[in-house]
Design a protein with these regions (language model features):
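Intrinsic-disorder/low-complexity detector
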Residues: 9-15
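Short alpha-helix plus adjacent loop in nuclease-associated cores
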Residues: 152-172
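Short hydrophobic/aromatic-enriched beta-strand-loop microsegments
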Residues: 145-152
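Ser/Thr-centric signal marking residues that sit
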Residues: 32-35, 154, 202
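Acidic two-metal-ion nuclease catalytic site recognized across multiple nuclease folds
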Residues: 2-6, 17-22, 183, 196, ...
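Active-site catalytic microenvironments for nucleophilic, acid-base chemistry
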Residues: 138-142, 160, 164, 183, ...
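Conserved non-catalytic scaffold segment of RNase H-like nuclease domains
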Residues: 2-6, 18-142, 171, 175-185, ...
Length: 262
């Protein structure tokens, strides 16, 4: 990628962040766990080539009220006919038994997701392109349609902020969600590869990237949610549940982190 292209991409990302920063809205943050990897050709439109969803999680956050309106987390029933490789189970921990006993029909999950999506002006995800494609392929399999509003990918927007070296030697690699969270807050959340946890973590990262504000400091509701789902015991003592949020150590803001890395 040449210098002009990099500058144009950075300017576009800055414009997107500024647009999100000044606009108050309801946003949907979502994540999926799947039966496997996407096809090598990400533009493939054949649903048979795409993995199935085994867990779908999303939340609706009102930036006007600074409040979570809905938090949904469902396991999907794969039946006995959809392959569920052991290597995928090793990542997300959802076995065939869990899927059969706790899962719901994918059509119900998609309908609820679609209705929730209509309430929102923006959707947010980490590696958004993958999650939207997986959802669209599931919708296509079930003769449904999904339309996503304006979107924000925390992975792509934060690439130049995290500055993680590419294994291929050119530019920076896309940061994983835990890498981004560690970069912003100097801690690694627990229970990764659970789409509910990843959704909560993504919201915290998004809010810091766009609003320069840590929700664990500014929102008692979110702080309790994050404390109960995403922290280890020693971090819970630091976060507290009913203590003074102003006593928490402030993480560096993204602008400060950028200056340190430059």
């Amino acid at each position: 990628m040449n210098c002009n292209s990099e500058q144009e991409q950075q300017q576009q990302q800055q414009q997107e962040q500024e647009q999100h920063r000044v606009t108050k809205m309801k946003i949907m943050v979502f994540d999926t766990e799947t039966t496997g990897l996407p096809p090598k050709n990400r533009q493939c439109t054949d649903p048979a080539q795409w993995p199935h969803i085994v867990q779908l999680s999303y939340l609706i956050y009102d930036t006007n009220a600074d409040k979570i309106h809905e938090l949904k987390d469902v396991i999907i029933s794969l039946g006995t006919h959809i392959p569920l490789p052991d290597e995928s189970v090793a990542i997300h921990g959802i076995t065939r038994t869990i899927s059969l006993q706790q899962g719901i029909d994918i059509r119900i999950a998609l309908f609820d997701f679609k209705m929730a999506l209509t309430q929102c002006s923006k959707c947010v995800a980490h590696n958004l392109e993958f999650d939207t494609r997986v959802l669209q392929m599931e919708a296509q399999r079930n003769r449904m349609s999904l339309y996503f509003p304006a979107s924000f990918c925390t992975m792509k927007v934060s690439t130049d902020l995290c500055k993680l070296p590419s294994p291929y030697g050119l530019g920076y690699k896309w940061p994983k969600l835990l890498e981004l969270h560690e970069h912003l807050f100097q801690r690694v959340p627990k229970n990764a590869h659970n789409s509910k946890i990843d959704t909560i973590v993504t919201l915290r990262c998004y809010h810091m990237l766009v609003h320069n504000e840590d929700l664990c400091r500014s929102s008692r509701e979110f702080r309790a949610l994050f404390r109960n789902h995403c922290t280890i015991e020693c971090e819970r003592d630091e976060l507290g549940e009913f203590g003074d949020m102003n006593e928490m150590p402030s993480p560096p803001k993204p602008t400060e982190l950028k200056e340190k890395n430059d």
